[in-house]
Amino acid sequence: MNLSFLMEKRHSYFISMILLWTSFSLVSQSSCAQNQEKIICNGIPWFDDQGKIVNAHGACIVEDAGRYYLFGEYRSDETNSFVGFSCYSSDDLSNWKFERIVLPIQKEGLLGPNRIGERVKVMKCPSTGEYVMYMHTDDTKYCDPCIGYATSKTINGEYIFQGPFKIGNEPIRMWDMGTFQDTDGTGYLLIHEGDIYRLSEDYHSAEKRLVKNMAPGGESPAMFKKEGIYYFLFSNKTSWEKNDNYYFTAPAVGGPWKKGGLFVPEGKLTYNSQTTFVFPLTHGKDTIPMFMGDRWSFPH
């Protein structure tokens, strides 16, 4: 199975793709033409059940009760400011239904007017059954970063913004972020340059920073586990320009972490993308890590 997709981003275009970690092979245009109902290819937009372009950027996918839910930034070409986070659902990762804007712009605060909201990630907390959403908030000059969180009783319901995400009494004031949920239900917050925080039992705060500054200069963090080994993906910092992304491995989330090099052939520039998420696709008795990457362009 190979899946890939295109979406629009900010003032710019945003291409995401889902690739099997084991092969990294892209779907050809001819195979797309033969399987238009089930495969979405790079280079063309997605359309939802309403015939509109899927607007979900910096995205993640969550599987819940046999259905897939795509969360992302709902973007406008008119402004870079936060508009809302969108949710789409699918039973085949190909045909998507627009659910709603699950978290709209707030009247004030971290996600109020003239603020940034990016890299939304959602996990279901196993101890409470609650759905917890995480995001990078900021001002429009990226000078006031803070990780925020929101909660909902249903995966596609209205999320209530709870404010800054903290360790102890201190907000975590960082930029690029991601999340990872281990097979035992433990949740983790991932930060650019390689900080890893273990979440509290209710996922509402961080209880401990396990790793600090693993990858200086790294951003767009994502993690997955395969056959007992943990993989941590990063991109280099090259502003809007694409680069060859790389990875670390470890026998445990707390380390020790060892740099493993590039995870796509050198010079391919991660298929012109930047890491955003790795979705654990359940396939029979196996779980297949599926890479999701953003393709950036600026200003349009």
Residue spans of the language-model regions?
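Bacterial Sec-dependent N-terminal signal peptides
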Residues: 1-36
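Carbohydrate-active catalytic/glycan-binding domains of CAZyme proteins
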Residues: 7, 32-300
